[in-house]
Amino acid sequence: MADQHVERVASVWYVELSGPDAAQVLRGVLNTLPAQAGFQGAELLSSPAQPQLALIASRWAGEPPSLPVPDGAKHWVFTVLEARP
């Protein structure tokens, strides 16, 4: 059996923004994340049920660095308690 290395995600950082340009604004934030230490991946999300709401869900090897968020954005860091592949 091949040795599989799975990088452990320790934290998830969510950033939420509402408004007609929310996805465009958060896309700018998303583009800065790969250069940060501990970054493991992220998605920019939207929902047809809430068309003016956009969300970044990013995964980190440890605590995410303290990063600026756009005016009006809400953000939270969660500790990953359990994960499944």
PLM regions and their residue ranges:
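Short S/T/G/P-rich N-terminal loop/turn motif that feeds into the first structured element of a domain
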Residues: M1-P85
